[in-house]
Protein backbone atom coordinates (compact mmCIF):
# COMPACT_ATOMS: atom_id res chain seq x y z
CA UNK A 1 0.00 0.00 0.00
CA UNK A 2 2.85 2.36 0.90
CA UNK A 3 4.50 1.69 -2.45
CA UNK A 4 1.26 2.68 -4.24
CA UNK A 5 1.22 5.99 -2.39
CA UNK A 6 4.82 6.75 -3.37
CA UNK A 7 4.11 5.70 -6.95
CA UNK A 8 1.05 7.97 -7.09
CA UNK A 9 2.93 10.91 -5.55
CA UNK A 10 5.88 10.49 -7.92
CA UNK A 11 3.62 10.10 -10.97
CA UNK A 12 1.62 13.19 -10.00
CA UNK A 13 4.82 15.20 -9.52
CA UNK A 14 6.16 14.10 -12.92
CA UNK A 15 2.86 14.84 -14.69
CA UNK A 16 2.50 18.24 -12.99
CA UNK A 17 5.95 19.38 -14.11
CA UNK A 18 5.91 17.71 -17.54
CA UNK A 19 8.80 15.39 -16.74
CA UNK A 20 7.45 12.38 -18.62
CA UNK A 21 7.63 12.33 -22.41
CA UNK A 22 4.33 12.93 -24.17
CA UNK A 23 5.15 9.94 -26.39
CA UNK A 24 5.33 7.51 -23.44
CA UNK A 25 1.86 6.02 -23.22
CA UNK A 26 2.29 3.44 -20.45
CA UNK A 27 1.46 3.94 -16.79
CA UNK A 28 -0.01 7.37 -17.50
CA UNK A 29 -3.42 8.60 -16.47
CA UNK A 30 -5.87 8.51 -19.41
CA UNK A 31 -3.32 6.98 -21.81
CA UNK A 32 -2.84 3.42 -22.98
CA UNK A 33 -1.61 1.17 -25.74
CA UNK A 34 -4.51 2.09 -28.04
CA UNK A 35 -3.43 5.73 -27.82
CA UNK A 36 0.10 4.72 -28.81
CA UNK A 37 -1.13 2.66 -31.76
CA UNK A 38 -3.50 5.38 -32.95
CA UNK A 39 -0.77 8.02 -32.73
CA UNK A 40 1.69 5.91 -34.72
CA UNK A 41 -1.03 5.09 -37.26
CA UNK A 42 -1.88 8.78 -37.60
CA UNK A 43 1.76 9.70 -38.33
CA UNK A 44 2.07 6.90 -40.88
CA UNK A 45 -1.16 7.85 -42.65
CA UNK A 46 -0.13 11.50 -42.71
CA UNK A 47 3.25 10.77 -44.32
CA UNK A 48 1.83 8.22 -46.76
CA UNK A 49 -0.94 10.64 -47.70
CA UNK A 50 1.74 13.20 -48.55
CA UNK A 51 3.52 10.64 -50.75
CA UNK A 52 6.44 10.13 -48.38
CA UNK A 53 8.07 6.92 -47.20
CA UNK A 54 8.33 5.94 -43.57
CA UNK A 55 10.78 3.72 -41.75
CA UNK A 56 9.81 2.04 -38.49
CA UNK A 57 12.07 0.28 -36.02
CA UNK A 58 10.46 -1.45 -33.06
CA UNK A 59 12.45 -2.15 -29.91
CA UNK A 60 11.74 -4.23 -26.86
CA UNK A 61 14.16 -3.71 -24.00
CA UNK A 62 14.77 -7.17 -22.58
CA UNK A 63 14.28 -7.31 -18.80
CA UNK A 64 13.99 -3.51 -18.87
CA UNK A 65 12.98 -2.97 -15.27
CA UNK A 66 15.86 -5.16 -14.11
CA UNK A 67 18.45 -3.04 -15.90
CA UNK A 68 17.70 0.35 -14.38
CA UNK A 69 20.79 1.74 -12.66
CA UNK A 70 19.91 2.61 -9.08
CA UNK A 71 22.59 5.28 -8.79
CA UNK A 72 21.56 6.73 -12.14
CA UNK A 73 17.94 6.82 -11.07
CA UNK A 74 18.73 8.61 -7.82
CA UNK A 75 20.85 11.14 -9.75
CA UNK A 76 17.90 11.62 -12.11
CA UNK A 77 15.60 12.23 -9.12
CA UNK A 78 17.86 14.94 -7.77
CA UNK A 79 18.24 16.57 -11.20
CA UNK A 80 14.47 16.97 -11.60
CA UNK A 81 13.91 18.24 -8.08
CA UNK A 82 12.63 15.13 -6.32
CA UNK A 83 13.69 15.32 -2.72
CA UNK A 84 12.41 14.96 0.79
CA UNK A 85 10.40 11.91 1.74
CA UNK A 86 9.95 10.65 -1.84
CA UNK A 87 13.72 10.60 -2.41
CA UNK A 88 14.33 9.04 1.00
CA UNK A 89 11.69 6.33 0.49
CA UNK A 90 12.87 5.62 -3.06
CA UNK A 91 16.47 5.31 -1.89
CA UNK A 92 15.44 2.81 0.79
CA UNK A 93 13.20 1.00 -1.70
CA UNK A 94 16.12 0.52 -4.10
CA UNK A 95 18.88 -0.16 -1.58
CA UNK A 96 20.09 -3.38 0.01
CA UNK A 97 17.80 -5.69 -1.97
CA UNK A 98 18.41 -9.43 -2.11
CA UNK A 99 16.81 -12.31 -3.92
CA UNK A 100 16.83 -16.08 -3.98
CA UNK A 101 15.11 -18.87 -5.86
CA UNK A 102 12.99 -21.55 -4.24
CA UNK A 103 12.23 -24.70 -6.25
CA UNK A 104 10.27 -27.55 -4.68
CA UNK A 105 11.08 -26.21 -1.24
CA UNK A 106 14.84 -26.02 -1.84
CA UNK A 107 16.15 -22.45 -1.59
CA UNK A 108 19.26 -20.99 -3.13
CA UNK A 109 21.52 -18.62 -1.24
CA UNK A 110 20.50 -14.99 -1.03
CA UNK A 111 22.31 -12.79 -3.55
CA UNK A 112 22.33 -8.99 -3.78
CA UNK A 113 20.31 -7.29 -6.51
CA UNK A 114 22.62 -4.70 -8.05
CA UNK A 115 20.21 -3.01 -10.47
CA UNK A 116 16.49 -2.60 -10.95
CA UNK A 117 13.82 -3.09 -8.36
CA UNK A 118 11.66 -5.86 -6.98
CA UNK A 119 9.68 -7.93 -9.48
CA UNK A 120 5.99 -7.14 -9.51
CA UNK A 121 6.60 -3.76 -7.94
CA UNK A 122 4.00 -1.02 -8.46
CA UNK A 123 6.74 1.58 -8.35
CA UNK A 124 9.07 -0.15 -10.85
CA UNK A 125 7.30 0.90 -14.06
CA UNK A 126 7.10 4.55 -13.00
CA UNK A 127 10.80 4.50 -12.13
CA UNK A 128 11.60 2.94 -15.52
CA UNK A 129 9.76 5.51 -17.64
CA UNK A 130 11.27 8.33 -15.62
CA UNK A 131 14.74 6.80 -15.99
CA UNK A 132 14.38 6.41 -19.78
CA UNK A 133 12.70 9.77 -20.41
CA UNK A 134 15.87 11.31 -21.85
CA UNK A 135 15.80 8.80 -24.71
CA UNK A 136 13.03 10.90 -26.24
CA UNK A 137 15.22 14.00 -26.21
CA UNK A 138 18.25 12.57 -28.03
CA UNK A 139 16.56 10.66 -30.84
CA UNK A 140 16.27 12.76 -34.00
CA UNK A 141 13.19 10.94 -35.26
CA UNK A 142 9.83 10.39 -33.58
CA UNK A 143 9.77 7.94 -30.70
CA UNK A 144 6.64 6.37 -29.28
CA UNK A 145 6.74 4.09 -26.29
CA UNK A 146 4.52 1.86 -24.25
CA UNK A 147 6.48 0.78 -21.18
CA UNK A 148 9.63 -0.96 -22.44
CA UNK A 149 8.43 -1.28 -26.04
CA UNK A 150 9.49 1.59 -28.28
CA UNK A 151 8.78 2.49 -31.87
CA UNK A 152 11.13 4.77 -33.81
CA UNK A 153 9.46 6.41 -36.79
CA UNK A 154 11.32 8.36 -39.46
CA UNK A 155 9.77 9.97 -42.52
CA UNK A 156 11.67 10.35 -45.81
CA UNK A 157 10.74 13.75 -47.22
CA UNK A 158 13.07 13.45 -50.21
CA UNK A 159 14.05 10.10 -51.81
CA UNK A 160 17.68 11.26 -51.93
CA UNK A 161 17.61 11.41 -48.12
CA UNK A 162 16.60 7.75 -47.76
CA UNK A 163 20.09 6.44 -46.77
CA UNK A 164 20.60 9.21 -44.20
CA UNK A 165 17.14 8.68 -42.69
CA UNK A 166 17.66 4.92 -42.49
CA UNK A 167 21.08 5.44 -40.88
CA UNK A 168 19.57 7.78 -38.29
CA UNK A 169 17.47 4.94 -36.96
Predicted regions, residues:
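Conserved pre-catalytic core of RNA-dependent polymerases
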Residues: 1-118, 154
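Flexible, glycine- and charge-enriched loops at secondary-structure boundaries
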Residues: 30, 125, 162-166
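Hydrophobic alpha-helical membrane-association signature
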Residues: 36, 127-131, 165-169
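Active-site flanking residues adjacent to catalytic metal/cofactor-binding acidic residues
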Residues: 59, 147-148
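Polymerase palm active-site segment centered on the conserved acidic dipeptide of motif C
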Residues: 81-88, 145, 159-169
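Short, conserved phosphate/pyrophosphate- and ester-handling motifs at nucleotide-, phospho-/glycolipid
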Residues: 120, 124
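Conserved helix-loop-beta segment at the catalytic/binding core of cyclic-nucleotide signaling proteins
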Residues: 140-144
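RNase H catalytic domain
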Residues: 150-159
